[in-house]
Amino acid sequence: EFRRVLFRSECAVLARQLAERIANELQVPCYCYEAAAKTPERKNLAICRKGEYEALPQRMSEATEAPDYGAREWDEQLAQTGCTAVGARDFLIATNFNLNTTSTRRANAIAFDVREKGRPMREGGSPVGKPMKDEKGEIIMQPGTLKATKAIGWFIDEYGIAQVSMNITDINITPLHVAFDEVCRCAQNRGIRVTGTEIVGLIPKRTLLEAGTYFLKKQQRSTGIP
């Protein structure tokens, strides 16, 4: 059986073709994101999802906000189906970091420390100060320490603890083991410890091998350990 590797650019073409078919055959408008994005801004899925379902009636009527395929005026069918997004990207790793606290606020603080988007800059450097804005009226963000990551803090009833929940959108920029160490460091700076982790879904084998090699070296042990 003949097999070959598909390049991301080829996947992007296929993603756009699929998005067009979904729009034409199912009448569900589609945004294209990541490698399939038609504009630089839409590489970020969060931009495509901006405002979520409630914002769709307005977005459908604006040329700069409308879906890439199947854009039309808001109607009863759209009210039922909404829109969808199709993209081409590398593996996304979804991981959760368990914390020895029940405080969602502290978990969020750690998430804001590390996620690429960071947190709003506030007047006087106070956590309760008013968000600072630029000349365009947009909130000024203080970037976090980990590129290509998104994160939030929440409380898990099942475990009775708070977590930092993270998506790593580019493992070539921020490998899993780097994210783990950085979350541990930022948690420790706030008097909190990471007590465990969860991986949600599939991850590449090389991610685990890289993590194993990294921590063996950190322990000053041979990387040849089976």
Language model features with spans:
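Short, small-residue-biased leader/transition segments that mark boundaries at the very start
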Residues: 2-6
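Long, contiguous binding/interaction regions
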Residues: 7-226
